[in-house]
């Protein structure tokens, strides 16, 4: 076990950063969900892409609110987060929301790939014609990994931590493999408890790498499809920026942004687990916590910029706010 004392000033700064990130996450994902739901009510129908985007936004919205509740509990009642049921509940909420956040984003990439790419392969055409069923099947199969993930975490929790109710301390066994990182208060000091588990790391990495691999394959297949389409356009002596090419490029931009953010996220998960063994510094761990929230927030804003309807709605809101501010400025004596 590694125990690092962190100054109250550092914790205050960390909490402020978390609050800013969570606020941005609530605004961004709330905006995506609100725009799509309002459009759904008006049109009495919703596209498959909007279904995925709305579900993804609601999932990340729940995650942001759960993190906000956890921070408020940490500030207002630090003794509450020492209760085993609170820790277990927060852990399960984080795992479930993180799982659906990543897998729904993966489904979005697969959906774009099947709808936009052009291949004459019979298997691809079979999947392309049944893209909705493919996305649904991906979600169903991912539930198996979710159950295994939660089951593995519960096993490690039972063997790694014994929380003494009413006493703000942990009793950890000699062979502890505690896979999570928690903050808790004790008098005027705050400690960060963590343990690098060489057994947990490959298991957790496996669960995270599966959707990443699926997204990566879809991304490279989309690049290959664009290359084939570009060659075909050259043979036919047509302009390179037809509708299909534009659709390919937009999908690739969205996919590349997701993969880069996802790769950075995975990188800091590994660094956060291994940092004590090689560096023993608290800054890497704090940055790891921040990156865990930055990934879904950043990707949500990427989705807003990459979706024409969401982008138009954003510009409309910004124009309204600017006109509103000018009106208030004129009315102000």
Curated annotation (Swiss-Prot):
InterPro entries: TAS2R
Gene3D superfamilies (UniProt xref): Rhodopsin 7-helix transmembrane proteins
Highest taxon listed in the record's lineage: Eukaryota
Biological processes per GO annotation: detection of chemical stimulus involved in sensory perception of bitter taste
Assigned GO CC terms: membrane
Subcellular location per the Swiss-Prot or TrEMBL entry: Membrane
Tissue distribution: Expressed in subsets of taste receptor cells of the tongue and palate epithelium and exclusively in gustducin-positive cells. Expressed in 15% taste bud cells in circumvallate and foliate papillae but only in 2% in fungiform papillae.
Membrane topology category: Multi-pass membrane protein
Transmembrane domains' residue ranges: 15-35, 61-81, 91-111, 135-155, 206-226, 254-274, 284-304
Record GO terms (molecular function): bitter taste receptor activity; G protein-coupled receptor activity; taste receptor activity
Keywords from the UniProt entry: G-protein coupled receptor, Glycoprotein, Membrane, Receptor, Sensory transduction, Taste, Transducer, Transmembrane, Transmembrane helix
Pfam families in alphabetical order: TAS2R (PF05296)
Topology Cytoplasmic: residue spans: 36-60, 112-134, 227-253, 305-333
Topological region Extracellular: 1-14, 82-90, 156-205, 275-283
Main location as per UniProt: membrane
Positions annotated as glycosylated: 167, 186, 195
PANTHER family, sorted: TASTE RECEPTOR TYPE 2, TASTE RECEPTOR TYPE 2 MEMBER 110
Function field: Gustducin-coupled receptor implicated in the perception of bitter compounds in the oral cavity and the gastrointestinal tract. Signals through PLCB2 and the calcium-regulated cation channel TRPM5.
Similarity annotation: Belongs to the G-protein coupled receptor T2R family.
Misc note: Several bitter taste receptors are expressed in a single taste receptor cell.
Protein's recorded name: Taste receptor type 2 member 110
UniProt organism field: Rattus norvegicus
Organism placement in taxonomy: Eukaryota, Metazoa, Chordata, Craniata, Vertebrata
Gene encoding the protein: Tas2r110
